[in-house]
């Protein structure tokens, strides 16, 4: 498929998702996505090089920069129908929804907190937020706020399991209140007991 065909396909899809949005923003978003697909890059310079037309490459880059920086383009509102649709379709299969939560350092002083849906050996992004921190983990309130948004997207009758590292331990109480299961990796020297009448054991002693 040529980039022109990709562009028109994305435009029609975006018109359905954000029907009330300005057509100029829809077209710019379509070019941004088309350029990403055909350049296989997220760098605006490479994306702009794939966009056809008489405009100079630098002008294309600046147009994309203005769009990305536009405060009126609310990412979550644009992506909400997509995320809700992914969760609905996955739940309709009758399988447990496996949500992967992860934090990754991006640049200097920022961390991307991302929740994805595990589906057919792929991780499909559902929702994300940025955390300003030079080092360390995201806070419990930030984690809970992100999961609370996703909780509103998940079909009420769906079974859910959340998978993540030990930094997401603050989520345990809220996940239990939603009857969501969770698997959070723990350090080997952490202690646990399987029942009230049993002794505390190191996690690494349970591995066989």
Show the residue positions of the predicted features.
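Electropositive nucleic-acid engagement tracts
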Residues: 2-31, 35-94, 149
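Short acidic/polar alpha-helix capping motifs at helix-coil junctions
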Residues: 8-14, 113, 136-140
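Local beta-strand/beta-hairpin segments that build beta-sheet-rich folds
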Residues: 124-130
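Short glycine-rich, polar/acidic loop-and-turn segments at beta strand-coil junctions
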Residues: 48-51, 62-63, 68, 102-105, ...
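Short, conserved catalytic/metal-binding motifs centered on acidic residues
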Residues: 47, 97-104, 115, 123, ...
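Generic hydrophobic, aliphatic-rich segments that mediate packing or membrane embedding
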Residues: 43, 60, 83, 97-99, ...
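An internal, acidic/charged active-site-proximal segment
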Residues: 130-208
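Structured nucleic-acid-interacting core domains from mobile-element enzymes and related host factors
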Residues: 73-124
């Amino acid at each position: 498929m040529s980039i022109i065909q990709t562009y028109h396909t994305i435009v029609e899809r975006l018109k359905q998702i954000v029907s009330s949005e300005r057509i100029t923003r829809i077209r710019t978003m379509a070019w941004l996505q088309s350029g990403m697909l055909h350049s296989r890059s997220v760098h605006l310079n490479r994306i702009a090089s794939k966009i056809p037309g008489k405009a100079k490459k630098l002008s294309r880059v600046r147009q994309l920069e203005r769009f990305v920086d536009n405060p009126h383009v609310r990412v979550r509102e644009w992506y909400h129908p997509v995320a809700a649709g992914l969760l609905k379709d996955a739940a309709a299969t009758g399988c447990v929804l496996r949500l992967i939560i992860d934090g990754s350092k991006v640049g200097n002083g920022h961390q991307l907190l991302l929740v994805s849906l595990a589906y057919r050996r792929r991780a499909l992004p559902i929702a994300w937020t940025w955390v300003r921190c030079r080092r360390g983990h995201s806070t419990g309130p930030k984690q809970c706020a992100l999961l609370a948004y996703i909780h509103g997207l998940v079909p009420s009758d769906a079974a859910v399991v959340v998978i993540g590292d030990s930094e997401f331990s603050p989520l345990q109480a809220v996940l239990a209140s939603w009857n969501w299961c969770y698997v959070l990796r723990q350090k080997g020297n952490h202690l646990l007991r399987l029942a009230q009448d049993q002794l505390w054991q190191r996690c690494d002693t349970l591995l066989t």
